[in-house]
Structure formats: structure tokens, C-alpha cells
């Protein structure tokens, strides 16, 4: 296989992995915990996964503490927990 064909194959496999939704049984347990703003007073834009609505939602993170259901972007949240 040529290097161009191999590169195309790797790109397609990566795209497929990014677009494949996370099923609820494969979803990490931390995706099911409620958002925790943390104990500090910063106003950081963050995202958490809401299992009832089955989507990522923006919230204000305090900047420290909190839990694992806390993502810097909606895309990062979707990759980890699905949508």
C-alpha cells in the first residue's frame, strides 16, 4: 500500500472513531454524576454530560476541585460521554 493510501486509511479510521457515539453501557461512570462547580471562585466556562437529557451542557466551574464530569469544551465532553 502506498504511503498516501495508508495515510488516507488512518484518517478515515480516526474520523470513524470520532463519529461513533458512545453507548450508554460503554459510557464512563463519571458521566452520570452531577456537575460540581468546585470550591474556588473563578468563573470558568466548562461542560458536563447530563445523562437525563443525553447531551453535554455548559456550566460555570469554580476553577479547582469538582469531579471528572467536567470538560473544557463541548467536543471533549461529547468524545468522552457521547451525545
UniProtKB/Swiss-Prot annotation:
Functional note: Serine protease inhibitor.
Tissue: Expressed by the venom gland.
Keyword Signal among UniProt keywords: yes
Signal peptide start-end: 1-24
Domain BPTI/Kunitz inhibitor span(s) in chain numbering: 31-81
Protein's UniProt name: Kunitz-type serine protease inhibitor B
Top-level taxon of the source organism: Eukaryota
Family listed: Belongs to the venom Kunitz-type family.
Intracellular or extracellular location(s): Secreted
One GO CC term, this protein: extracellular space
Keywords on record: Disulfide bond, Protease inhibitor, Secreted, Serine protease inhibitor, Signal
SS bond list: 31-81, 40-64, 56-77
Pfam family membership, one: Kunitz_BPTI
Gene Ontology molecular function, alphabetical: serine-type endopeptidase inhibitor activity
Site, as annotated: Reactive bond for chymotrypsin: 41-42
PANTHER family per UniProt: BPTI_KUNITZ INHIBITOR DOMAIN-CONTAINING PROTEIN, KUNITZ-TYPE PROTEASE INHIBITOR-RELATED
Major place of residence: secreted
Amino acid at each position: 500500500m502506498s504511503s498516501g493510501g495508508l495515510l488516507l486509511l488512518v484518517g478515515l479510521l480516526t474520523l470513524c472513531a470520532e463519529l461513533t457515539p458512545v453507548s450508554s453501557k460503554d459510557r464512563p461512570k463519571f458521566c452520570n454524576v452531577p456537575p460540581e462547580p468546585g470550591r474556588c471562585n473563578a468563573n470558568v466556562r466548562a461542560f458536563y454530560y447530563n445523562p437525563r437529557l443525553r447531551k453535554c451542557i455548559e456550566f460555570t466551574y469554580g476553577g479547582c476541585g469538582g469531579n471528572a464530569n467536567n470538560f473544557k469544551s463541548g467536543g471533549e465532553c461529547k468524545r468522552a460521554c457521547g451525545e
